[in-house]
From Swiss-Prot:
Pfam families: BOP1NT, WD40. SMART domains: BOP1NT, WD40. WD repeats lie at residues 435-474, 478-520, 569-611, 655-693, 698-738, 754-784. HAMAP family: BOP1. This is Ribosome biogenesis protein ERB1. Keywords: Nucleus, Repeat, Ribosome biogenesis, rRNA processing, WD repeat. Residues 15-25, 36-88 have a biased composition (Acidic residues). InterPro entries: BOP1/Erb1, BOP1_N_dom, WD40/YVTN_repeat-like_dom_sf, WD40_repeat_CS, WD40_repeat_dom_sf, WD40_rpt. Residues 1-125 are annotated as: Disordered. The gene is ERB1. Component of the NOP7 complex, composed of ERB1, NOP7 and YTM1. The complex is held together by ERB1, which interacts with NOP7 via its N-terminal domain and with YTM1 via a high-affinity interaction between the seven-bladed beta-propeller domains of the 2 proteins. The NOP7 complex associates with the 66S pre-ribosome. It comes from Podospora anserina (strain S / ATCC MYA-4624 / DSM 980 / FGSC 10383). It comes from the Eukaryota.
Length: 784
């Protein structure tokens, strides 16, 4: 019962021992054979090999091989007959294997330490405690079968790595150890690897190892040489020096070995004498080069002909610095073509008129003609005459050389400061005043800077709060005529507003939150003072049959209740109202009134006067001098300055404009600006000249209003029909020798153009750098 399992177990152990012994003995015999072969190649001398017969060597070798095989078989039998050998038995077997090494007679055995160095393996213990031979990796040399490429580390053979996808390793090395799969990074590491490319990087992966396949330094050098068109092998010389294995020179032994004499290395004196003799003969002409007879005869004939250079002794003259080249003829035009366009050909009437005109009075000396081809064009009959006249012009007409100056146009322009350095000035719209129906024709800010008055085409006058845009008061002056102008009385002792509608000028005291009862009563007293003066019989009498220059009256109960206290009626429609700086006089302009177009009104006396019997042109606008008793009247083309005390003409200013639209004077009284309908803004220095000091064109359409800042700020502005306002920085220096500084700083856009009309009027705040504008779009705007 128990014998069967024991036998089975014994049989299994025998098989395991057989396999282990076979592996160990096979390795041992293989190593011994290699050592024997190396010993034979290294230590057998050649003289002994010659003495030994080849046949005996073969027989001896075969006998030795048979003996070794018998011994190995005996050892195998011994191993098969027992169980796994012990350590003593393994030592005995290894000793027997050492005794079985093949040695040749007459050959000295190697020393033991040299044999250990020459061995290509190591002896280690296996799992059972036995010896195990671990061979070194083969390093191929130049004489090996594969010396170019190193043997693969992975020894799995030609097997796809996909078979190892489910294993942590990818194969085995030559020693049977597992080659673990290389670690792979995440996407960020892959991106960094592609950015920081190492030296020799190819972007490929080794199929056998899974590692990146990089090029070695030798491979990189090989690639570089191929790219540069060089020979791949650095040591290869494609153009070696020629080795003459055979020569045509016959080298014979000299008869004498004496050294060469010095005369062999020095030039011959006899030859030098012969050469100098030939040189002297060539210089003297006794030796001539060979020439054909024909050429020699031709030279002799040329020598017989004597030629003289008449300009031989003439010295070159310097070029005349006064020479002026003749002007060039103008290039021909289309009318001189033999086939001109139809519009250049004259009609029958033009031809007859040209023929009847005298040749001296003709604009052209010829009439354009048309020919179908150039060959049909006849000769020009007056060619000789034209050439003669051209020569006469060049001969008789004097020429003048004009020196042109190469001047940069930008250097002639004045250096203007930057607009950012000239602040403050208005830049943006702050408040929009809406309420009028139609065009807002006039606008004005009161002397305190709180209230704003506007007059429009709807015949109404409206008063607004300047900062909030709230309408405070409104009155309708006329249902037929528009309100052309509104102007505040310039003094602060009364709150009086003047407005014109048709032939009437209305004086009113509008209610406002800033007006105190005392100020309101003072304003009413100023307007009512003139009625007492007229009642006392002080009103000047007019000639019989003529209307008075102005009628002062009360407007009626309805308007008086609204705040309109006085109405002044003149002979024609009033378009302009201008106050004197003291507030007791104001002037009106009626362009259609002819002689009575300009009138001066006295508020304290309710008196109207016509200062001019005759005006040279239609009056457009007037303005009082801010400091002197001077009165400026602008007609269509000129501005006349009158002295009201002396009643005389002081100056005539000629702006050069075709039609003057507006006028204003600087607070200093020495400078004047004029706006015109021909799109020009003109600055006049009254002390300098009657002509404009500077002309500015910044608008594509007409300029309707110009205004200086009265509060001391160096600002002025103009309003145009293109819907824009142009703000200028205008500084007047105290020194009269200096010119004023005029810089355009800002263009304000906001108003819409209605029926070719844009911005109609403009006014400045008395203290702040703010301005207000009235436009044809029915709005008024406050710019800050």
């Amino acid at each position: 019962m128990k014998s069967k399992p024991v036998e089975k177990k014994r049989k299994v152990r025998d098989e395991e021992s057989d396999s282990e012994s076979d592996d160990e003995l096979a390795n041992g015999l293989f190593d011994g054979v290699l050592e024997a072969s190396e010993d034979e190649e290294d230590y057998i001398p050649s003289d002994e090999i010659d003495d030994v017969d080849s046949e005996s060597e073969v027989s001896e070798g075969s006998e030795d091989a048979e003996e070794e095989e018998e011994e190995e078989e005996g050892d195998d039998d011994a191993l098969l007959s027992d169980d796994i050998p012990s350590d003593d038995e393994m030592g005995k077997l290894s000793k027997d294997a050492e005794e079985l090494e093949i040695t040749e007679p007459g050959v000295d055995p190697k020393p033991k330490h040299q044999e250990e160095e020459d061995r290509n393996y190591k002896v280690v213990k296996d799992a059972n405690g036995g010896e195990r031979y671990v061979y070194d990796e083969i390093d191929p040399v130049y004489d090996s079968d594969d010396s170019d490429a190193q043997g693969p580390v992975n020894t799995i053979g030609n097997i796809p790595l996909s078979f190892y996808d489910s294993y942590p390793h990818i194969g085995y090395d030559i020693n049977g150890k597992k080659i673990m799969r290389p670690a792979t990074g995440d996407a960020l590491q892959s991106l960094l690897d592609t950015i920081e490319v190492p030296k020799g990087w190819t972007g490929l992966t080794d199929v056998n190892t899974g590692n990146p396949l990089n090029l070695t330094q030798e491979e990189l050098e090989l690639v570089r040489r191929v790219q540069h068109g060089l020979v791949p092998d650095e040591g290869y010389d494609p153009y070696p020096d020629t080795v003459e294995w055979f020569t045509s020179k016959q080298e014979t032994m000299p008869l004498s070995a004496a050294p060469e004499p010095k005369r062999r290395f020095l030039p011959s004196k006899n030859e030098a004498k012969q050469v100098m003799k030939l040189v002297r003969a060539i210089r003297e002409g006794r030796i001539l080069p060979y020439k054909p007879p024909e050429e020699r005869e031709r030279e002799e004939e040329e020598k017989e002909e004597v030629q003289f250079d008449i300009w031989q002794d003439e010295e070159p003259a310097a070029p005349n610095p006064m020479h002026i080249p003749a002007p060039k003829l103008p290039p021909p035009g289309y009318e001189m073509s033999y086939n001109p366009p139809e519009e250049y050909l004259p009609t029958e009437e033009e031809r007859e008129e040209w023929e009847k005109t005298d040749p001296e009075d003709r604009e052209k000396e010829f009439l354009p003609q048309k020919f179908n081809s150039l060959r049909k064009v006849p000769a020009w009959g007056t060619l000789v005459k034209e050439r003669f006249e051209r020569c006469m012009d060049l001969y008789l007409a004097p020429r003048v050389r004009k020196n042109r100056l190469n001047i940069d146009p930008n250097s002639l322009l004045p250096k203007l400061p930057s607009p950012a350095e000239l602040k403050p000035f208005p830049t943006v719209v702050q408040t929009i005043f809406r309420g009028h129906e139609g065009t807002v024709r006039s606008i004005a800010i009161d002397p305190t800077g709180v209230a704003l008055a506007t007059g429009g085409s709807d015949g109404t006058v409206r008063v607004w709060e300047l900062l909030t845009g709230r309408q405070v008061w409104s009155v309708k002056l006329s249902s037929e005529d528009p309100v052309y102008t509104v102007r505040w009385r310039p003094t602060k002792d009364a709150f009086v507003l003047a407005a014109s509608a048709g032939e009437d000028v209305f004086l009113m005291v509008p209610p406002h939150s800033s007006v105190t009862p005392t100020l309101d009563q003072a304003s009413r007293d100023v307007l009512a003072a003139g009625f007492g003066y007229a009642t006392n019989g002080q009103q000047p009498a007019t000639a019989p049959g003529k209307e008075p220059a102005g009628k002062w009256a009360r407007p009626g109960t309805k308007l008086e209740d609204a705040g309109v206290l006085v109405r002044v009626t003149v002979r024609s429609a009033v378009k302009v109202i201008t106050w004197h700086r003291r507030g007791d006089h104001f002037a009106t302009v009626s362009p259609e009134g002819q002689r009575s177009s300009v009138a001066i009104h006295t508020l304290s006396k309710h008196l109207t006067q016509i200062p001019f019997r005759k005006l040279h042109g239609l009056a457009q606008t007037v303005v009082f001098h801010p400091l002197k008793p001077l009165f400026f009247v602008a007609t269509m083309r000129t501005v006349r300055c009158y002295d009201l005390q002396k009643v005389e003409l002081v100056k005539i200013v000629q702006p050069g404009a075709k039609w003057i639209s507006s006028l204003d004077i600087h607070s200093g009284g020495d400078h004047l600006i004029v706006g015109s309908y021909d799109r020009r803004l003109l600055w006049h220095d009254l002390d300098l000249s009657n002509r404009p000091h500077k002309t500015m064109r910044f608008h594509p359409k007409a300029i309707r209003a110009v205004r200086f800042h009265k509060g001391g700020l160096p600002l002025f502005a103009d309003a145009s029909d293109d819907g824009t306002l142009q703000i200028f920085y205008g500084k007047v220096p105290n020194d009269q020798l200096e010119s004023p500084t005029i810089v355009p700083v800002k263009q304000l856009k906001g108003h819409k153009v209605v029926n070719q009309v844009g911005v109609v009027d403009i006014d400045w705040h008395p203290r702040e750098p703010w301005c207000v504008s009235a436009g044809a779009d029915g709005t008024a705007r406050l710019w800050m």
